[in-house]
Every structure is written in structure tokens, then in C-alpha cells.
Amino acid sequence: MRTSYLLLFTLCLLLSEIASGGNFLTGLGHRSDHYNCVSSGGQCLYSACPIFTKIQGTCYGGKAKCCK
């Protein structure tokens, strides 16, 4: 009996997260900007991009540049 209450409580918490905006599930399926930069052949640098490379985006939440 105690197990069924625990299961019901867990289910209610999960459904309340989904209904309230889904902060719990928002990050699923989203790639970080660092991952997108490196997988497209770039590199994340805090300093200026080297010669013959261009800024293609940002890394680490806009704190660094993606140079490619």
C-alpha cells in the first residue's frame, strides 16, 4: 500500500512539472553551443580568433567565440 502511494506521488510530481512549463524536460534534445561549434569543425576560444578564421557563433553561453 505504501508503495502505491509513493508511485502516485511521483507520478503527480512528474505531471505537475510537465504542465507547469516543463523545466524538467526543456533541456532534453537541446545541444549546447559548445557541442554545436565543435561538431561543425570549429573551436571555442576566449581570446581573438586566429588568422584566417572567422567567428561562426558563441560558446559557453556567449562567453567565448566559435572560430572556424
Swiss-Prot record:
Residues 22-32 form a propeptide. One of its GO terms (cellular component) is membrane. GO terms for molecular function: CCR6 chemokine receptor binding; identical protein binding. This is Beta-defensin 1. It comes from Gorilla gorilla gorilla. Monomer. Homodimer. Keywords: Antibiotic, Antimicrobial, Defensin, Disulfide bond, Membrane, Secreted, Signal. Has bactericidal activity. May act as a ligand for C-C chemokine receptor CCR6. Positively regulates the sperm motility and bactericidal activity in a CCR6-dependent manner. Binds to CCR6 and triggers Ca2+ mobilization in the sperm which is important for its motility. Belongs to the beta-defensin family. GO terms for biological process: antibacterial humoral response; antimicrobial humoral immune response mediated by antimicrobial peptide; calcium-mediated signaling; defense response to Gram-negative bacterium; defense response to Gram-positive bacterium; innate immune response in mucosa; positive regulation of flagellated sperm motility involved in capacitation. It is found in: Secreted; Membrane. Disulfide bonds join 37-66, 44-59, 49-67. Residues 1-21 form the signal peptide.
